[in-house]
Amino acid sequence: MSEGDTTGAGVAKPGGPRLSDVQMTEVRLTTPVSDADIASLKLGDIVYLDGVLYTAREGVYRKVVDEGCGLPDGVAALTNVNFHCSPAASVKPDGTYAVEAVTATASFRFGKSFTRWFERSGAKVIVGKAGLTETAYREYFVPHGAVYLTTVGYGLGATYGRAIKRVVDVHWLKELGIAQAMWVLEVEKLGPFLVEGDHEGRSLFALANQEINLRLDEVYRGLPKYAMSRFGETTSRKDEVV
């Protein structure tokens, strides 16, 4: 796989864990997370975060990875959790900021930067949308002892926002704008998130895809005969063009 090829969830290998093994245990982690925390997480665990984390997406990655700026002073000591998201931020009457909702962004777009990002940021948890391939987890995450948490569905931006207690700091706001700036946020029970990529590089989505794919032929066999013979209608998986 090329360095930037991180789209999709990949395919889990036969003989590994099954979807029925997923327990979906609820877990609360306090940042910065420890190596023991990382090792304890299992695929499908429901995670809530307490403490401090920061937002970082394309603009911040460009500053840190491409321009070599490093994280702003003090951030790495506070937290090792990076949320791929944009905040809905506003200025309060006293001049401080409020973040009332966040919108996660798809993490595959950062694939080519992950190795250098982990080296320069010390991040151990990436929170984002949609997940990556198992190849990406094993190539980029596992060597740095990191895991991936995915947001759950759409429409939870306000729910996540209610867990934000305060804005600790904001960096590169004038240069990058609200959506791309780094927002350092104190949170309490921020979630739910799902463990999508664990410390061994396994993917929850790939595990689900594997079991779904095994039963697709059975699904096709149960389809009724199409009535109008329109282009693209079929009751055979092998005849599908996609």
Predicted regions and their residues:
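C-terminal binding/interaction regions
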Residues: 170-227
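Feature captures the catalytic cores and cofactor-binding loops of soluble hydro-lyases/lyases
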Residues: 55-191
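Cationic, low-complexity basic patches in intrinsically disordered or flexible, solvent-exposed regions
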Residues: 14
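Short, structured beta-strand/loop micro-motifs enriched in basic residues and often containing a Trp
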Residues: 24-33
